[in-house]
From Swiss-Prot:
Site positions for Required for DNA-dependent dimerization: 124
Residue ranges of DNA binding: 76-151
Record-level Gene Ontology MF annotations: DNA-binding transcription activator activity, RNA polymerase II-specific; DNA-binding transcription factor activity; DNA-binding transcription repressor activity, RNA polymerase II-specific; nuclear steroid receptor activity; protein domain specific binding; RNA polymerase II cis-regulatory region sequence-specific DNA binding; sequence-specific DNA binding; steroid binding
Cellular localization per UniProt: Nucleus; Cytoplasm
Name under which the protein is recorded: Steroid hormone receptor ERR1
Tissue: Most highly expressed in kidney, heart, and brown adipocytes. Also found in uterus, cervix and vagina.
Residues modified as N6-acetyllysine: 129, 138, 160, 162
Species lineage: Eukaryota, Metazoa, Chordata, Craniata, Vertebrata
Cysteine-cysteine disulfides: none
Native species: Mus musculus
Amino acid sequence: MSSQVVGIEPLYIKAEPASPDSPKGSSETETEPPVTLASGPAPARCLPGHKEEEDGEGAGSGEQGSGKLVLSSLPKRLCLVCGDVASGYHYGVASCEACKAFFKRTIQGSIEYSCPASNECEITKRRRKACQACRFTKCLRVGMLKEGVRLDRVRGGRQKYKRRPEVDPLPFPGPFPAGPLAVAGGPRKTAPVNALVSHLLVVEPEKLYAMPDPASPDGHLPAVATLCDLFDREIVVTISWAKSIPGFSSLSLSDQMSVLQSVWMEVLVLGVAQRSLPLQDELAFAEDLVLDEEGARAAGLGDLGAALLQLVRRLQALRLEREEYVLLKALALANSDSVHIEDAEAVEQLREALHEALLEYEAGRAGPGGGAERRRAGRLLLTLPLLRQTAGKVLAHFYGVKLEGKVPMHKLFLEMLEAMMD
């Protein structure tokens, strides 16, 4: 089991009720209600280099036309683990009742499996019981979240999400010893990465998938519904991620909520921008949902595509590295301006520790002398106002969608939207 960060107070996320048409009767099923998907996702294509899942359950890329959403070859709502018909989203991905129950039993029982072969067994509907080790490995590979499983075995009620990474707690505040780590992006020198940066790299959430449905009707409403569902799942992951940041869990529970409610969209928007860095004039909302500016407009996002691309181009010009991204993301969290924060000094202490970690990383990257690290850190920090401005536009747009009442939204997403617009 993962070790606990000192001071963690659990946040509770209530699961959505089960879909009335969910498949029943599997010998492996349990009765825990699934977190259901909002209806009508939009067609889209995958990120370059994204491999299709075996058994045809991954999203294939189609031919891209100018400003159009491109249909994926994904069959309607299949389980990403075994390819059976999915009953909804369970623990972060589309999955069937059997794989949902298997994953739940494995986590609750802390069961360890071993593969009798070479850890490369094919997992299909017919063969999913043949190798439990490879089945569980595939559950994790497609993105099932361990923190989505209640560990008390009590059915129903409120669902407790613990932090994902199984890492030792990092003391806060304190010194951040440096160690060498190769910097991504070419033949640059190695940069010393302090313990905080290393920790942030470890706790960075795994990929989420939008799972757009190519059988959904034309129009922008299905696409907006897909994004609302994606954002709802990302909020759950963001809460878990924030809890793993040293210093955040030492805040009072009310201050944790105030911080999250004020900056969650900035964290999500920065994630979209980071996924889009390898692309040219396209936005990667998820691994399997990539739109250009015209495609975003066709999907009902109005001018948001242009606003998001402006942020992406700013970060592309800076050649943002992954270490810098995880620091910038944590700084965006700590950069809350909520008037409801009770202990502003504690939040400021967290912000200063992250700022120092950024300066230390840039100092190792730039080498001694010249103050280049401070200039680089300053340029990165100057992207935060644009990030906040862009997130504000996204919030305003989806709050307008909420007021129209034409697109179903999950309870958590609604609550976070309303908290921001109050």
